[in-house]
């Protein structure tokens, strides 16, 4: 338990129906008693049981300045594992800020970013992977991304890691006994069982690592470059995906001269769209700079939507664009399917994961594109309720664990001694413990919680 009692606004800033000020620490009830007066004089804050609520008034220096509700949680049955009081006042910056100031004057300290969840972690209410999931859940834009975060918060990843640790720990106990006490009558380790355990653990880690990229897309979204020749329909596509007229659309070639940005939700995926200048040869210095930025965005993007004018034959610029998309996560959209087709899609097909005929003015094409993007990025194959990795810290630890297990398997196949296998299994266990947060350094813990906002 922490010695200080902390206070902060737990809800988003700005106008709203309510705002919540959260207290956590041994003096939470004492602080609440100084700033909250129950409407029923027979009710006492100090005597309030956990999981109960009282209606009353908030006071500052003896002056009532708002009315609201106090929710009480007794340690250890609270989010942080400490005594917690949540004070719900009317929304709006002035009232909530005054309530926090009253709490500070009554003896509380300002909460640091992520301090509530950090206390939950330090008090054993959450593991480190679950604490990381809290921020993922707060940041989630799509239903699947939120489901992935909720699964991690519920302990899906922690349980999966625990199962692999248990399997390797049992194996290591036998290996250690065999290596350290060769003169004792220790049963010989069954090599088939050894191979089976190592293979199963590696398969599990391979699955987590393999799904990491698609899981990350669901959690964080992806940068998407819309590229193509002038008047191919790029800005029309941006407007279709955005659901409103974000970009100017005219018949004049070169209307878009700079990169136009817009975040959109396409199914369960957040796309950070970049509508780029039309690709062509030009002597206009401003347009040329826009085209240079277009190529740069294409190189940087995690997803490319290349738009081609289906009403015209392919040009040299079209073929150059196709070649630059080779080996990239790119979808070719042959636009204007409502007009007679003159575009030979077979010329560009080898360079793209898929080629789709679309009409960027029709809502039906939005659904077609959404399904194609989900297939290309692999998000349609993700079980949102399964264990998943989140963030570079977890991925790096999983990769180290996988490398150590693979090394143990190679050592067995090479016929080296069990002591060499034991070293590899030890390394794998260390990496899994780091993944679970069991041996995380203070620097790692700081890195996790610095992502959080004040009040969480």
Residue ranges and their predicted role:
Residues 1-147, 151, 155, 331:
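A glycine-rich (often HGG/GG-containing) alpha/beta subdomain
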Residues 55-65, 70-74, 254-282, 300:
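Switch I (G2) and immediately adjacent beta-strands of P-loop GTPase domains
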Residues 242, 277-278, 302, 309, ...:
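Short glycine-/small-residue-rich Rossmann-like dinucleotide-binding loops
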Residues 271, 303, 331:
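Short, Asp-centered acidic motifs that coordinate Mg2+ and/or phosphate
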Residues 287-311:
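Inter-motif core of Ras-like GTPase G domains
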């Amino acid at each position: 338990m922490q010695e200080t009692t902390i206070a902060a606004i737990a809800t988003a800033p700005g106008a709203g129906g309510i705002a919540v000020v959260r207290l956590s620490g041994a003096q939470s009830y004492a602080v609440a008693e100084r700033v909250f007066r129950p409407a029923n004089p027979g009710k006492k804050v100090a005597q309030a049981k956990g999981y109960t609520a009282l209606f009353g008034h908030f006071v500052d220096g003896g002056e009532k300045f708002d009315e609201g509700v106090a929710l009480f949680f007794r340690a250890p049955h609270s989010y942080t594992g400490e005594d917690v009081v949540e004070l719900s006042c009317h929304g709006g910056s002035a009232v909530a800020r005054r309530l926090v100031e009253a709490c500070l004057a009554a003896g509380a300290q300002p909460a640091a970013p992520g301090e509530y969840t950090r206390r939950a972690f330090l008090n054993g209410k959450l593991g480190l992977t679950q604490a990381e999931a809290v921020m993922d859940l707060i940041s989630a834009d799509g239903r699947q991304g939120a489901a992935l975060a909720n699964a991690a918060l519920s302990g899906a990843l922690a349980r999966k890691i625990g199962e692999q640790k248990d399997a390797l720990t049992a194996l290591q106990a036998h290996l250690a006994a065999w290596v350290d006490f060769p003169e004792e009558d220790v049963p010989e380790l069954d090599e088939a069982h050894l191979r089976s355990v190592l293979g199963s653990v590696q398969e599990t880690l391979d699955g987590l690592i393999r799904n990491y990229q698609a899981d990350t897309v669901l959690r964080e979204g992806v940068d998407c470059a819309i590229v193509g020749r002038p008047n191919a329909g790029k800005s029309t596509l941006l407007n279709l995906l955005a659901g409103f007229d974000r970009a100017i659309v005219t018949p004049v070639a070169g209307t878009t001269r700079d990169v136009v940005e817009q975040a959109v939700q396409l199914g369960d995926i957040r796309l950070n769209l970049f509508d780029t200048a039309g690709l062509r040869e030009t002597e206009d210095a401003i347009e040329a700079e826009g085209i240079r930025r277009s190529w740069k965005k294409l190189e940087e993007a995690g997803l490319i939507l290349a738009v081609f004018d289906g009403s015209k034959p392919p040009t040299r610029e079209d073929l150059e664009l196709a070649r630059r998309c080779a080996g990239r996560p790119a979808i070719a959209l042959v636009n204007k399917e409502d007009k007679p087709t003159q575009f030979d899609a077979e010329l560009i097909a080898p360079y793209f994961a898929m080629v789709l005929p679309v009409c960027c003015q029709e809502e039906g094409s939005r659904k077609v594109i959404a399904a194609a993007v989900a297939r290309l990025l692999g998000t349609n194959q993700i079980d949102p309720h399964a264990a998943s990795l989140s963030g570079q810290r977890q991925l790096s630890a999983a990769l180290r664990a996988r490398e150590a297990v693979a090394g143990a398997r190679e050592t067995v196949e090479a016929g080296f001694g069990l002591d060499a296998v034991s070293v590899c299994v030890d390394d794998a266990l260390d990496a899994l413990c780091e993944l679970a947060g069991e041996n995380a350094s203070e620097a790692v813990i700081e890195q996790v919680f610095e992502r959080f906002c004040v009040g969480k």
